[in-house]
């Protein structure tokens, strides 16, 4: 593979994470405007965004098999057509049913693109370099989560219709579409060149189960925590601006953490540093929940920084449980993480209704403790050392 081809594929991976980050995180910015557009209360409008999450979940799950049937380049180009149709549907329709369908299609497109992006990184890079590259790729999710809410605020403040925000997000996919030209993708399944030697199917091992549970608990814990931090802070008497600043601080330090750990991870055994980070994150979250108001900003800043590498490290370790990176295995762990996203309000909503926001934060803290236990247990069964040893950089 030529170096220019590798760079193009890497940028497709970066932009695939930016696309999903933009679609997921911009929701809160435009929800009120969309509710006004359809003349509905915000509470009922928020339910339609479940179609976006459902599309992401279904596509990540199915793409483990689709990757071996439909070439990756074909998927990305067809995804561009679907993206154009979905954005056009948002622009020219006043039907709530069509809005929900367009959101579902956007979810499908971003889920397929992100699973391809993740797989490309696991194919292009090996050993410790894979972890650092995947972490840098994941930082584009957070970067888009910072940039596109600002774009949305800029457009909405000038009374420009909300659907132009999605047109701007579509430009990210336009860049992916352009990059597919003159670019060779890894062939999979029936499209791959088969050698004379039969391909030995590798067993995943119990370590994959530990990582899948860790992925689900981490995402459910993280989103359950950050979703209720503003309500918890307001309950302590903090202003709305101060409560919002806590969330901004978390994501800002999370992004800086990703950049820092994309360099740091190269020098450590991934399972050991993951266990340390998971343990630190659980302790820091507990200190945030039980600490004083004066210390809360510092605890959430350090929590964001030290927890930033956890999810990507889980995916990287998963890809290293087999000698050859398996798209089905990577997508299985991604699917478990996405299930955590879907369950966020299903799990935390009733807890808040019954016991208040602090109970939801403590539940999230318990889930982080489960992540630590899973990562610790993985140390006894992980195969990543024997598979990545020859490829370590």
Curated annotation (Swiss-Prot):
The keyword Cell inner membrane applies. Keywords: Cell inner membrane, Cell membrane, Membrane, Transmembrane, Transmembrane helix. The keyword Cell inner membrane applies. It is found in: Cell inner membrane. Pfam families: MFS_1. InterPro entries: MFS, MFS_dom, MFS_trans_sf, MFS_TsgA, MFS_TsgA-like. GO terms for molecular function: transmembrane transporter activity. The chain crosses the membrane at residues 11-31, 51-71, 78-98, 101-121, 134-154, 162-182, 206-226, 245-265, 273-293, 298-318, 332-352, 361-381. Its main location: membrane. GO terms for cellular component: plasma membrane. It is a multi-pass membrane protein. HAMAP family: MFS_TsgA (MF_01044). Belongs to the major facilitator superfamily. TsgA family. This is Protein TsgA.
